[in-house]
Design a protein with these regions (language model features):
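Interfacial segments of multi-pass membrane proteins
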Residues: 151-163
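Membrane-helix interface "capping/anchor" motifs
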Residues: 88-97, 136-147
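Alpha-helical membrane-embedded segments
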Residues: 167-179
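Membrane-embedded alpha-helical core segments of multi-pass
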Residues: 129-133, 144, 175
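Alpha-helical transmembrane segments and their membrane-interface boundaries
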Residues: 1-113, 117-129, 160-166, 170
């Protein structure tokens, strides 16, 4: 196409780009509407609320003075709660996946922290920890997406103590599954 002026060139470009600004184009990115009833939505939300609250409360009571130096909830537990309460039939929300995936990933992340010092590159250690956690979760059939976040959290938080994988990670997971 030949343009007679810069204005023609700009006008043609804007005309071609207008398709990206049309409401129909943006609607294509929206997820399909869910058919979850209001009652079911409330059950999911209240389940997650009670699950996280009880997990935090029981960990705080069980941990006692140790919790002055440790958190009693780990952040990836929020994502685990979404799976457990919103997708309870999912293989990734089953007890073995939640408990095994997060705990295994915590241990892998702790090893990854030591790798930071060997490799001298925290980015590489973080990437290796997440990739290794995924590989091991697949091998042990306990794939749980928040486990990747758990491994990453350990490396980024420079958590070196293996007991952190037991308390709070393992304890959090067991209590959430029981909630």
């Amino acid at each position: 196409m030949k343009f007679h002026s810069a204005a023609d060139f700009v006008a043609d470009g804007l005309r071609r780009l207008s398709v990206f600004f049309s409401p129909a184009w943006w609607r294509a990115f929206q997820p399909a509407r869910t058919r979850i009833s209001t009652r079911e939505r409330l059950r999911l939300v209240i389940g997650a609320l009670i699950g996280i609250f009880l997990t935090g409360l029981l960990c705080h009571l069980i941990g006692g003075d140790d919790l002055k130096r440790l958190p009693w909830l780990v952040a990836p537990l929020g994502a685990s709660a979404v799976l457990v309460f919103a997708l309870p039939a999912s293989p990734m929300a089953q007890p073995w996946a939640v408990v095994g995936g997060n705990t295994l990933s915590a241990l892998v992340g702790i090893v990854g922290v030591h790798g930071v010092y060997l490799l001298g590159a925290p980015e590489l250690a973080a990437a290796l920890a997440v990739a290794t956690a995924i590989a091991l979760m697949l091998t042990l059939r306990c794939l749980h997406p928040p486990g990747g976040a758990t491994a990453l959290m350990m490396v980024l938080g420079e958590i070196r103590d293996p007991s952190f994988a037991l308390c709070p990670v393992l304890l959090n997971c067991i209590l959430l599954v029981l909630a």
